[in-house]
Structures are given as C-alpha cells and as structure tokens.
Curated annotation (Swiss-Prot):
Organism for this UniProt entry: Brucella abortus (strain 2308)
Residues covered by the HD domain: 73-217
HAMAP family: dGTPase_type2
Family under the similarity heading: Belongs to the dGTPase family. Type 2 subfamily.
UniProt-listed Pfam families: HD (PF01966), HD_assoc (PF13286)
UniProt keyword annotation of Hydrolase present: yes
Protein's name according to its UniProt entry: Deoxyguanosinetriphosphate triphosphohydrolase-like protein
Entry keywords, A to Z: Hydrolase
Superkingdom classification of source: Bacteria
Region (Disordered): 20-39
InterPro entries, sorted: dGTPase, Diverse_Catalytic_Enzymes, dNTPase_2, HD/PDEase_dom, HD_domain, HDIG_dom, PHydrolase_assoc_dom
Any one GO molecular function term: triphosphoric monoester hydrolase activity
Amino acid sequence: MSLEGIGFGYRERAPYASNPAFSRGRLVPEPESPTRTPFQRDRDRIIHSTAFRRLKHKTQVFIAHEGDHYRTRLTHTIEVAQIARALARALRLDEDLAEAVALVHDFGHTPFGHTGEDALNERMKKFGGFDHNAQSLRIVTKLEHRYADFDGLNLSWETLEGLVKHNGPLLGPYAAHPDIPVPQPILDFNARYDLELSRFASLEAQCAAIADDIAYNAHDIDDGLRAGLLTLESLDEVPLAKRLLDIVRTRYPNLDPVRTGHELVRRQITIMVEDVIEEAQRRLASARPGTMEDVHNQPRALVGFSDAMRAEEKVLKRFLFKNLYFHESVVVRRHAADRIVQDLFDACFTDPSLMPDEWRLGCEALDKAALARRVADYLAGMTDNYAVREHRRLFDRTPDLA
C-alpha cells in the first residue's frame, strides 16, 4: 500500500485490527450502546472525565504558568491522539481505540511533569513506589467517581490493555524493561482482570505509543525555540533537523525564525509519521498476522520507527536532554518543584487532616502503606497551580517557579 490515497474514502478494516464487535467487554458488564462502539464510548468517557480536564494545568516540560503558549499535558495529549488516529487510519486499524489509548496515556502524571513523579516515587519507595502508568490505571479503574454502578470509568479490556502495555509487554521474554519490577497496582488489578502482561498490546496501542514519541520530539523543539532555550543554529547539530532546516531555508530564504521553526516542526512530524507507516507496512508484510491474536503473539512490536529513523531520533533525544530538559533554567525550576511535592507528601502523611474531606475521611483506619498510597493519589491528582497554592497555604514559603 503506497502512501498516496491514505485517508480518502472507505477502506476495509484490516483483519489484524482490533474489532469492537469482538471486544472482550468490561469488568462490570453494561448494555451496549445502540449508537457507539465500545471503543467510542471509552474515548468519550475519557474526554468527559475529571482527570482529562486536570491535564490542562499539568506541565509537559515547562512549568505550566510560565506562558500560555507552551504545551501542557492536555495539549500534548490532543496532539498525540491526532497522530495516533492518522497512523491507525493509514494502517486500516480502529481509529477510535488508538485515540482512546492516546487520550488516556498521561492520566497518571503528577504536577510538574517527570520531576513531580520522581519526587513522589522517592517518598513512596518504602510503600511500593509510584509510577505514572500504574497511576493512570488506578484513575480509570478506581479513583474517578462519576458513575452509580462502578468506580472508575469501566473501560473496555482493549483500552485498559493498551493503557498498561502501550510501550510493550511488562513480563516474560519480550518485556520492554525486564529489570524493572511491575508496579504493584498493575499486578493487583491484573489478578482481577487479566491483561496478559507478557504479550504485546494491540496495533492501535502501538500507534498511540509511537505517536507519543513523535509528538514530544517535535513539540519540545517548538517550545524550546519559543522559550529561547534552543536556537535554529543549535539544531544544526542534529542531522535530521539540519536536513529539514536546509530544505526550509532553500525554499524560503527570507523566512523569519519563528516561521522557520514551525516549518521544521511540521516537516519533522510528517517525516516521522511516514517512516512509521512504511516501516509498519514492511513488518506486517513480513509477519503476516491474520488476526488480532497473531498481533498479540508477535515477538516484537509491529508499529515503530525504521532502524535508520530510530537512530536519528536517539541523536535528537540526546540533544534535547542536553540543551532543553537539563538547561540551567529548567533545572532550577525542577529543584523547586521537587521540594514542593516532597514537602506536601510529608505534611499530609504526618497529618492527613490537611487533605480535603474526601481524602482524609477514614485515614485513621489505614496502615502506613495504605495511608501513603492515599496521599500519593491525592498529590498525583493535583495540578501545578493547585500544588503551588497548597504549599503556600501550608508553608508560606513556596519556592519561586516564575
């Protein structure tokens, strides 16, 4: 299948695509909708959830209140969903499932991005640790309180499987990170509802995973240029970026730097998306899966970058880590955010009455591990701004994040 014509008109679902007509169902059985597939209902529940709205005020790379035009978890999530749908459409997969997994993949992130997660994990080490992917699962299976008949969102098996395993199997010979223990919340849920942790997730989930990489690689460049932490000249160090910039400069020799940066970003997204489509088609032609089960039983992911693009992406990531994620101004804010999260955990763990009613009720009956998890759930749900306000209320000495 060539890239020409993709997205035009009706194209038959691939035999190895996830099929909502054969969904494995939900943990709590529900009547089917007469107007929406199970995966469409999952997507809609995710969009209408409280956790989805909170993403608006959670940091992607920069502290959220630094500027209105930088990415937040919400804008990043929407961008990932768009790319995931495009990939699924090109590969004749279920677009709604790919979108649902993309929309839910960052639910468990703490305030202040990975800095907040690291800080919370440090405090939770004695109590099973903290992992944002496991927290996403807790949110959609336990912590969202919207429906009369169940806690969580009661998502379909396929969406939950994609959420937990979109980056690869967690157990077995094909585990993505065999040296890292599977987070306890995932093991606990899996004991109730087997997500087949040793097998690969659906192709739709794999689309969401690679879409995440494509989105943040490109858009962190955009935000870095906007913040003045990166320059177009510095990006000439990255072979992929230099090739694309040379194309832009040749075609538009008098283009201003802002538009030049945007032209770079859009071309980078395009070239990565096209690479994934071509590579996935090559792997599918080689593996020849005939059913969804064949996809689950593969020894490797079938959706991903080509070897050449993966090598170029690694160079780009190294550049971003050196020049953006560990830029001095970002590191200073990271230290301040780390202090806020750890201070809040210590305070609420020592005195649970500092938490709102719905979180502190019943804390006196909890053992230390259960109390620590309750506090972690509370803190993980905070937005950046709420965490700053709570720290100021409790300590009146909040570090300056501006």
